[in-house]
Amino acid sequence: MYTIHKDFNFLKNLLTEFLSQPDLIERFQIMKQTKISGWETWFQIELAIFLQQHENVAEWERESRHSLDKRKKDYRNNVSIDFYIRQKYAQESIPLEIKQNEVARKCIRNMINDIAKFRSIRHSSLRTGREPWCLGIHNKVTEKTIRDYLIDYELNYLENCLWIHEVPNTEYMVTLF
């Protein structure tokens, strides 16, 4: 349990810093004003650049491919994990999936599907024993609304490992679980 809380706090602090960057906030505002959609890959690239320069990140990897366990629900033969992030002095990396959808409910559902996808990876293919985390970027809604979605989708999550955060000066927010 200690590792889960430690990973959560590391990711939360890292992402708080990332989402507070003035240039990133300006781009969020422009995307909203111009109605640009489908920017999940852009977000991942921005995060990769941030991770590369961050003093508390020892290494990171993006789009790591894994074989699926055929005994479990079949999505495809292989699947990619968006990020593995290893904190300095840590032995293993933290898997992080990222989802972006303007509609918060759809974003949360897609995040939950990514957790299921991670659980379908063949154990011998995994790089880490760490629990997977999902970060969703969506339009602002109330915290209660997010919690209601999690109940609706029957997601079992640790209450103190849920982070709902408004991206400063934008119409977006993030959810991490």
Place the predicted regions along the sequence by residue.
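Mg2+/Mn2+-dependent nuclease catalytic core
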Residues: 103-125
